[in-house]
Amino acid sequence: MKTFSAKAHEVKRDWFVVDATDLVLGRLASEIAHRLRGKHKTIYTPHVDTGDYIVVINADKIKVTGNKALDKKYHRHSGYPGGISTTTFGKMQERFPGRALEKAVKGMLPKGPLGYAMFRKLKVYAGDKHDHVAQQPQPLVIQSQA
């Protein structure tokens, strides 16, 4: 018996749509990262992108537990001296709905070209409309545990 290794051109990728209304940020991001990597498939191979496409709608309605809406901080730096900028989860959700989910998922994927290719299969939309009706995405139910 030989160990199976998936080939990139043989992988069948499905499209799924996730409604993020009232789901917890970290738990949702973890499940999405798991599916983007393809770890839910029997043909999973670490060095091949075997994951599916995920479309997230209602990303503006994602929740965080506890007081993290005010306490959770996101930092970035412009590259100039004194150019550090900090924002909270609540402010980021108001200004850029869905960016917190993108950052959470991106942090859970591998770093490097393979991880970047996996991240490109994630499509996040703030409202309940998306541009991927032609791909006929199947609804994916993720259980809320909060």
Swiss-Prot record:
The keyword Zinc does not apply. Belongs to the universal ribosomal protein uL13 family. GO terms for biological process: negative regulation of translation; translation. GO terms for molecular function: mRNA binding; structural constituent of ribosome. This protein is one of the early assembly proteins of the 50S ribosomal subunit, although it is not seen to bind rRNA by itself. It is important during the early stages of 50S assembly. GO terms for cellular component: cytosolic large ribosomal subunit. Part of the 50S ribosomal subunit. The gene is rplM. Keywords: Ribonucleoprotein, Ribosomal protein. It holds the Pfam family Ribosomal_L13. This is Large ribosomal subunit protein uL13.
